[in-house]
């Protein structure tokens, strides 16, 4: 019996159900940004669910939407637990995932550099013992 994978399986189902609930929308007027559930983790005892969310919009929209999500956590916990038929309802904790915003910012900077005719410089150092590009061609 492989019970050690159960938290990962429950976390994935939790993420899926929560995404579906958020897609249907919540009645909280603060939730105006587009919310994406980027991941979830479940504690080994299935009592804590950490859900990573990305919110598209300006800073104010992100803050208001995140506050609305936190306020709706109890409702979302109950609805997800009811859908998954869990014996115990995991405590839901939202964490803002900056990776999507960071990726968008990097993409925007690269696009701007290309339109200005600049190629982004590689910050990668050559491996020890490797010849520089101009010596390698000789």
UniProtKB/Swiss-Prot annotation:
Q: State any GO CC term.
A: cytosol
Q: Name one GO molecular function term.
A: ribosomal small subunit binding
Database matches in Gene3D superfamilies:
3.30.300.20
What is the first-listed, main subcellular location in coarse terms? Answer: cytoplasm
According to its UniProt entry, the protein's GO biological process terms are:
maturation of SSU-rRNA
Enumerate composition-biased segments (Low complexity): 119-131
Assembly, per entry: Monomer. Binds 30S ribosomal subunits, but not 50S ribosomal subunits or 70S ribosomes.
Query: What is this protein for, i.e. what is its function?
Result: One of several proteins that assist in the late maturation steps of the functional core of the 30S ribosomal subunit. Associates with free 30S ribosomal subunits (but not with 30S subunits that are part of 70S ribosomes or polysomes). Required for efficient processing of 16S rRNA. May interact with the 5'-terminal helix region of 16S rRNA.
Listed name of the protein: Ribosome-binding factor A
- Source organism per UniProt: Anaeromyxobacter dehalogenans (strain 2CP-C)
Show the taxonomic lineage: Bacteria, Pseudomonadati, Myxococcota, Myxococcia, Myxococcales
